């Protein structure tokens, strides 16, 4: 991570940290870095979610792009993966999404996609940061015909919807409940599932700029759970603010998280011989029950650090086609280059329809182990050195020995705060409490701060 760019672009409180001035500079410098080797007029696609600050930041960002001679295609409200898809299929120079994903409405963010539809490499982000920190802006300042032009491109949404529908099958007779989080999916999910002939019910479809992710969506699926039971739906599908993740609800109102969704889709692909190298890419936070289910069905796994960008890196390097996170980011590389909630939802319902199995039956193939996570405040200089403390290393080794292979311990530093995270999984809640609390007590004694 750099000074401005985090693991998912530039984020902050809109108009306080992520200001219009910064958005203008990101448009100007980001547009230049991503298009400097173009021979013709560069084209950049820009979209946003439904936050009240979106149009303010969009205007500033677009002005920056236009100031370096870029032709800007304004997509309006669109899911993040829609930008990625359109950039790649329409041969654009780059794409920019204005969103803070699952964060509350006061936050916003700006993330770039290269011409290949993938998020930027670290060296490209550092190049943009160097321009942001330079004492003087020395980039070209074209005038007259050298300036960029602005094109409204509402047909981008239709093209993305058509693509999504093309990946699915007829869902006639299936009751589907949708929660679009008052976010980007609110402009597309209804149309997509109606085109697939599903019988739908929808909540979270009235964005007002302030209610995105507010007690709704993939991080707050409680209302969707109620809707599924009220309507007798076969499945509930909850997206986040920019629709790059999915959390599902089965016909009984129970949550089906990213681990289970990945397993269901992965097993289906594996049985058809379509799972590349018969491998699913996951992160260290995936549940032990997910790993055991993969082992039982002869499916391989590749494990990365936390963050969908690391999952994508591993997928690209090793040519895997399915990966994701417990949080609901699922990347299906045969179709798109980033997590896509609506695409994942379509593939999940396809498996249900083709197998004739209910979602609860499909999800029951993975037994999720109880999990507990405790955050312990430590000196920032010590959070990366915890395993070098003899007492901490010893207690972890002792707890792992007691588990006898039927549990898991993960101790890792926070990426942004002076915290050490202690996580354990085991067959019962009592065992999880014992393992986590025992380790946490030693960590607090050795390196904890008040």
Swiss-Prot record:
Catalytic activity: alpha-D-glucosamine 1-phosphate = D-glucosamine 6-phosphate
Enzyme Commission (EC) number: 5.4.2.10
A GO term for molecular function: phosphoglucosamine mutase activity
Cofactor, how bound (note): Binds 1 Mg(2+) ion per subunit.
Keyword field contains Phosphoprotein: yes
Gene Ontology BP annotations: carbohydrate metabolic process; peptidoglycan biosynthetic process; UDP-N-acetylglucosamine biosynthetic process
Any matching Pfam family: PGM_PMM_IV
Active site residues of this protein: 101
Keyword Cell membrane recorded: no
Any one GO CC term of the record: cytosol
PTM: Activated by phosphorylation.
Cofactor(s) recorded in Swiss-Prot or TrEMBL: Mg(2+)
Keywords, sorted A to Z: Isomerase, Magnesium, Metal-binding, Phosphoprotein
Phosphoserine modification, residue list: 101
InterPro entries tied to this protein: A-D-PHexomutase_a/b/a-I, A-D-PHexomutase_a/b/a-I/II/III, A-D-PHexomutase_a/b/a-II, A-D-PHexomutase_a/b/a-III, A-D-PHexomutase_C, A-D-PHexomutase_C_sf, A-D-PHexomutase_CS, Alpha-D-phosphohexomutase_SF
Cross-referenced Gene3D superfamilies: Alpha-D-Glucose-1,6-Bisphosphate, subunit A, domain 3, Alpha-D-phosphohexomutase, C-terminal domain
Residues holding Mg(2+): 101, 240, 242, 244
Functional summary from the UniProt entry: Catalyzes the conversion of glucosamine-6-phosphate to glucosamine-1-phosphate.
Entries under PANTHER family matching the protein: PHOSPHOGLUCOMUTASE (ALPHA-D-GLUCOSE-1,6-BISPHOSPHATE-DEPENDENT), PHOSPHOHEXOSE MUTASE
NCBIfam families (UniProt xref): glmM (TIGR01455)
Family the entry assigns: Belongs to the phosphohexose mutase family.
The name this protein goes by in its record: Phosphoglucosamine mutase
